[in-house]
Every structure is written in C-alpha cells, then in structure tokens.
C-alpha cells in the first residue's frame, strides 16, 4: 500500500492511523459539505447558543468521520467506515478526536506543519536579531 501510517497515542492506548486515500478525501469533503448545510439550515432564527451547539457537534462528527476513514485501512475487509464512525463517536472523548483529527490531517497533507519559531531556518532568526527595531514613531530629521 502507498499510504503513510503512524502510531496515534492517547493516554495508555495506541493504534495505527493512516493517511486518507484520494477517494476518501473526496468522500470526506462531501461529508463536510453535507455537515455545513445541516449546520446552516434555518440558521436565521436560532440563538447563538444553538449555533454554537451545532458547530461543536459538526466539528466532532467531521473529526470522527476522518478518524473512521483512517482506521478503516487497518482492516479493509473488516468493519465498514460507518460502523467505525459510530464507534469513534460513542467511545472516544472529544479531546482524543481532535488530536487524532489533526494528526491524520497532517499525515494526509491536509494541513501544513507549523515550524516553531522558524527553527528549520537558522538564517531567519539571525536576520531578525540584526534587523532594526520597528517603531510606530516618525523618524526625527537628521541635524
């Protein structure tokens, strides 16, 4: 198989996650589109609390779907994505769903890794140290 994989750890549990295939990415985008339509349906007359609840639920469902699609690669002949999705929703805490979602998106190239303080580019930090300080004040005329 050509798909990248890595270990996902949550507390004392560990499992293998996979990047999404091209077809799964298309299916995931379609799922997200349906979720967005559900969240925005009849949104004009609802309270802020109702909208917040809809958005949180949608975020959790989208994360659980992504995880289910990834986990499916552990045994393609076994449990289907829909069953895995329901298992993730009913058995995983929201924090674990969020962490796994981010890890799968990074693995799948759906998010760009963030460099910590330009650690990968030592020239950038050297330039920042030698640069003149930035100020909102107008420069004084030379005398």
List PLM regions with ranges.
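Short, isolated positions in well-ordered beta-strands
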Residues: 13-17
């Amino acid at each position: 198989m050509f798909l990248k994989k890595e270990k996902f750890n949550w507390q004392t549990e560990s499992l293998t996650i996979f990047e999404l295939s091209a077809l799964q990415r298309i299916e995931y985008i379609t799922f997200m589109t349906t979720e967005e339509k559900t969240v925005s349906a009849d949104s004009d007359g609802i309270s802020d609390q109702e909208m917040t609840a809809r958005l949180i639920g949608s975020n959790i469902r989208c994360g659980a779907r992504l995880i289910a699609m990834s986990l499916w690669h552990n045994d393609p002949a076994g449990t289907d994505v829909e069953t895995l999705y329901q298992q993730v929703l009913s058995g995983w805490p929201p924090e674990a769903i969020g962490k796994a979602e981010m890890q799968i998106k990074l693995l799948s190239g759906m998010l760009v890794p963030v460099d910590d303080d330009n650690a990968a580019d030592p020239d950038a930090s050297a330039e920042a140290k030698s640069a003149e300080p930035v100020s909102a004040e107008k420069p004084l005329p030379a005398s």
